[in-house]
Amino acid sequence: MSSAVIFVESATPGTLTEFKDLLAKQLLEVRETWSLEFRTYRTLVKDFPSREKLLYSLTFPHHDKKTVLIRNSLAWVLGTAEIPDNLQTCSTGLSESIDQLLASKLSNMWAQRQVIRGDAGQTLLITGDVTVRIINLFAATGFKGLLIELDNLQSATSLANITDLLNEMKVKVFKVASAPGLKSEDVEVVDSSSTMESGNEALFTLAKQYIEVLE
């Protein structure tokens, strides 16, 4: 089972409805709504190598309420109010998220660079048992774009099916991040490959795909 993430920066808020309408013929079931939060932090420690200056935090309520922290090739997959072992001394011991900890106890080390959020996204099951999640994303500056998350892709054909719909909508520019083995000649695929320290590999791969299209 593989995933892919597509981001359409040139979209308008109404693009989501147009895309959903095109999926109607393939629709098997409408499922739960979902949300997303993507944060980027930059280190304030001057002697860090440039490649280590960014930390990414992605919170996925629709994936068991997990938060994925990624810094270079290391990742931590955390549950609600779960703190990595090496940061336990910074925690108050109360129910706090890793983002709350970064904003309070670790604010002298990490500065929040950007926050991208999406709420009330839609989940659709389509032909081929592919799960399509669509959501409008917003940043502090306003509307950011349309994001599409695909789960249970079995082949490049499943991915091309979705990108073909975007082409039908005359969407000329969009970013695609796909797991290895799902490359399509019709789209520019960002390869998501890295190693993780521990945790949920599939969720780590998905988080890397989000970073590739949103950065």
Swiss-Prot record:
Its Gene Ontology molecular function terms?
transcription coregulator activity
- Some GO term, biological process aspect, for this entry: which one? regulation of transcription by RNA polymerase II
Q: Which Pfam families match?
A: Med20
The UniProt keyword set, sorted, is: Activator, Nucleus, Transcription, Transcription regulation
What family does the database annotate? Belongs to the Mediator complex subunit 20 family.
Outline the subunit composition: Component of the Mediator complex.
Q: What does this protein do?
A: Component of the Mediator complex, a coactivator involved in the regulated transcription of nearly all RNA polymerase II-dependent genes. Mediator functions as a bridge to convey information from gene-specific regulatory proteins to the basal RNA polymerase II transcription machinery. Mediator is recruited to promoters by direct interactions with regulatory proteins and serves as a scaffold for the assembly of a functional preinitiation complex with RNA polymerase II and the general transcription factors.
Q: What name appears for this protein in its UniProt entry? A: Mediator of RNA polymerase II transcription subunit 20
Give the taxonomic lineage as stored in the record: Eukaryota, Fungi, Dikarya, Ascomycota, Saccharomycotina
